């Protein structure tokens, strides 16, 4: 369960951070 969440976070967090901070 945790490895799955870590994988999803690793995939989506950079995109969310990029959209929020406007730093890509």
Curated annotation (Swiss-Prot):
Signal peptide: none annotated. GO terms for cellular component: extracellular region. Expressed by the skin glands. Its main location: secreted. Pfam families: Antimicrobial_1 (PF08018). The keyword Magnesium does not apply. It is found in: Secreted. The keyword Disulfide bond applies. Keywords: Amphibian defense peptide, Antibiotic, Antimicrobial, Disulfide bond, Secreted. InterPro entries: Antimicrobial_frog_1 (IPR012520). Disulfide bonds join 18-24. It comes from the Eukaryota. Antibacterial activity against Gram-positive bacterium S.aureus. Belongs to the frog skin active peptide (FSAP) family. Brevinin subfamily. This is Brevinin-1Bc.
